[in-house]
């Protein structure tokens, strides 16, 4: 089907009021404690003291976290990287906004850890080697209500964001979405969650069955977390499973 253009976009922070209502607590709460099983969690706090922020450490966090200070990307950590202290910034100021987006990347379905898995942050956050006791706001983001998105809410470059792509089909047929140039996230096709993509590979293209398409206008909804995107998505006729 060739190239399909991005026709609208909005970043996660502008979209939040349409997707989730915050739940507050003194310390961050795991995804499961918020009644959620999959997707993402966003943790937000205002650092009221005037300080120079130069390190972050998350306790009992899973699986992948991106931290922002006043919407500036400060840290990205995955799996065992979450267990260590990370130098950031430094960031200076008072009333700085700390936002941590945590992705649930899957669950173990066997063995001794079956009943002990917690996603999101189930411990605390350490700032400058001190435990941060703040009024945390937690936003549960299972991404099941994307029809509520308002693409006119606003957009800032470099932030996690939603992208709307449209293309026309005469006769539905199998195709492959080439996600080269996009960072990490997932794709929804005509309200069906097609799957995840990641520039780390090895797979470069997502298989899109023709059964998910319809004659006329079709829609892709892409959520991307790394601030990496293109103006188009290419729909190809061959797969790309990466380097052999």
Report each predicted region and the residues it spans.
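C-terminal effector modules of nucleic-acid-centric enzymes and ribosome-associated factors
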Residues: 156, 160, 183-184, 193
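Aromatic-lined ligand-binding clefts that engage carbohydrates, nucleic acids, or primary amines
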Residues: 53-68, 98, 167-190, 197-198, ...
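Short, surface-exposed tryptophan/glycine-enriched loops
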Residues: 85-97, 162-170, 205-217
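Aromatic-rich membrane-interfacial microdomains
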Residues: 74-83, 195-206
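Terminal leader/tail segments of proteins
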Residues: 176, 206-244
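Composition- and surface-driven signal marking solvent-exposed, interaction-prone regions
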Residues: 69-72, 79-80, 112-114, 180, ...
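Carbohydrate-binding surfaces of carbohydrate-active enzymes
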Residues: 1-132, 143-153, 221, 225-228, ...
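Short beta-strands within extracellular/lumenal beta-sheet-rich domains
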Residues: 37-48, 158-170, 204-206
């Amino acid at each position: 089907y060739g190239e399909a253009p991005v026709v609208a976009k909005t970043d996660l922070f502008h979209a939040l009021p349409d997707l989730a209502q915050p739940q507050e607590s003194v310390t961050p709460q795991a995804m499961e404690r918020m009644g959620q099983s999959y997707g993402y969690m966003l943790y937000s706090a205002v650092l009221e003291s005037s300080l120079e922020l130069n390190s972050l450490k998350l306790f009992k966090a899973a699986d992948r976290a991106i931290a922002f200070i006043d919407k500036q990307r400060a840290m990205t950590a995955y799996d065992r990287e979450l267990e260590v202290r990370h130098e950031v910034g430094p960031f200076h100021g008072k009333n700085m906004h700390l936002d941590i987006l945590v992705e649930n990347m899957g669950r173990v379905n066997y063995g001794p850890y079956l009943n002990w898995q917690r996603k999101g942050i189930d411990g605390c956050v350490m700032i400058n080697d001190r435990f941060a006791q703040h009024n945390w706001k937690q936003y549960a983001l299972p991404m099941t209500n994307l029809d509520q998105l308002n693409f006119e809410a606003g957009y800032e470059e470099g932030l996690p964001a939603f992208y709307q792509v449209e293309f026309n089909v005469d006769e539905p047929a199998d195709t492959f979405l080439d996600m080269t140039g996009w960072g990490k996230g997932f794709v929804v096709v005509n309200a069906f969650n097609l799957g995840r993509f990641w520039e780390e590979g090895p797979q470069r293209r997502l298989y899109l069955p023709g059964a998910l398409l319809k004659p006329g206008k079709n829609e892709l909804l892409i959520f991307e977390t790394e601030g990496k995107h293109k103006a188009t998505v290419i729909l190809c006729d061959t797969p790309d499973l990466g380097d052999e």
